[in-house]
Amino acid sequence: MAPLRPTRPCPECGKPSTREAYPFCSPRCKNIDLNRWLSGSYVIAGKPLGEEDENDS
């Protein structure tokens, strides 16, 4: 049986990803990534909270 999608490297360690932890290779790498999001290491750029557009008035 052919795999549903091509194997990609784990974004944390570079090992081949597994179906159970996709796109990661293991629950450990999955948890490392989650911790980085929760601790603020990863952020999505945007306007600071409370800043209003000048065109909204």
Swiss-Prot record:
Disulfide-bonded cysteines: none
Functional note: Inhibits all the catalytic activities of DNA gyrase by preventing its interaction with DNA. Acts by binding directly to the C-terminal domain of GyrB, which probably disrupts DNA binding by the gyrase.
Quaternary structure and partners: Interacts with GyrB.
Necessary cofactors: Zn(2+)
Highest classification ranks of the organism: Bacteria, Pseudomonadati, Pseudomonadota, Alphaproteobacteria, Hyphomicrobiales
Protein name stated in the entry: DNA gyrase inhibitor YacG
Keywords noted in UniProt: Metal-binding, Zinc
UniProt GO MF annotations: DNA topoisomerase type II (double strand cut, ATP-hydrolyzing) inhibitor activity; zinc ion binding
GO biological process: regulation of DNA-templated transcription
Pfam families linked: YacG
Binding site for Zn(2+): 10, 13, 25, 29
Keyword Metal-binding carried by entry: yes
Domain of life: Bacteria
Keyword Iron-sulfur: no
The record's free-text note on cofactor binding: Binds 1 zinc ion.
